Amino acid sequence: MTENTSTRCGYVAIVGRPNVGKSTLLNHILGQKLAITSRKPQTTRHNMLGIKTEGDVQAIYVDTPGMHKANDKALNRYMNRNASAALKDVDVVIFVVDRTRWTDEDQLVLERVQYVTGPLIIAVNKTDRMEEKAELIPHLQWLQEQLPNAEVMPISAQQGHNLDALEAQIAKHLPENDHFFPEDQITDRSSRFLAAELVREKIMRQLGAELPYQITVEIEEFKQQGHVLHIHALILVERDGQKKIIIGDKGERIKRIGSEARKDMEVLFDSKVMLNLWVKVKGGWSDDERALRSLGYGDL
């Protein structure tokens, strides 16, 4: 840290149960789509940094997988471990909860964050959907009783309600530091990682409840040739039947997945994209620690 610096910089963990709006919150704060979203729980599998630099303040957000009770497969253990690890060595923790709904998985997260010694903010999401705001007060009071040292803030990650106030509160808690990243950098993740995540998002939005959790995406080629970015993506599934579902009747579903992913890639990478998708069966990959490591899932 330089002497008499007026700049602030620090890490902010975004935690909560699956499908509560953590990635939507990150995307709205950043002002662009970075983290993938869907209505299905456990869409986020990896911790990912989203970096926002505004004036003298650089907030480095850690978007985490939702903490959940299922721990039966190596992939589930990896996601839970990633989410828990994010609580360490950060400057601020944001605990995202729903405006009224409280689940066993919310309770699981609460039991972890109650040991946080630094600043803790409970972001009560989706409050824009409540016609009678007075109905929210008992829930806010109950949350405050559970975590007396936390600050409770109603927000809407989707609509952006009260996010300016949330960011201002976060900035107050960040330590005085030189900025860790260049002003124009928005993530620590590679373009190949982001491309794979966009394909996986489109699959999750198209398919049924169970199948998406047995699918992962690997980028085999990522090459800029002139004005066109060529991306070859391999979709891994665990059974032949799953491969047929992804391909769809006469290849219609995989064409739709590819078309939607390509549009988002062209916006993200600011380039024309030629996207090719293949589907391959790799039985039991989601419970094979060696396979998970080879697919970029880190330490298990």
Swiss-Prot record:
Residues covered by region (G4): 125-128
Domain of life, per lineage: Bacteria
Residue ranges of the region described as G1: 16-23
Protein's UniProt keywords contain Coiled coil: no
The gene coding this protein: era
Annotated organism of origin: Pseudomonas entomophila (strain L48)
Domain KH type-2: 199-283
PANTHER family found in the cross-reference section: GTPASE ERA, GTPASE ERA, MITOCHONDRIAL
Residues bound to GTP: 16-23, 63-67, 125-128
Record keywords: Cell inner membrane, Cell membrane, Cytoplasm, GTP-binding, Membrane, Nucleotide-binding, Ribosome biogenesis, RNA-binding, rRNA-binding
GO cellular component: cytosol; plasma membrane
Organism placement in taxonomy: Bacteria, Pseudomonadati, Pseudomonadota, Gammaproteobacteria, Pseudomonadales
Region G5: start-end pairs: 155-157
Annotated protein name in UniProt: GTPase Era
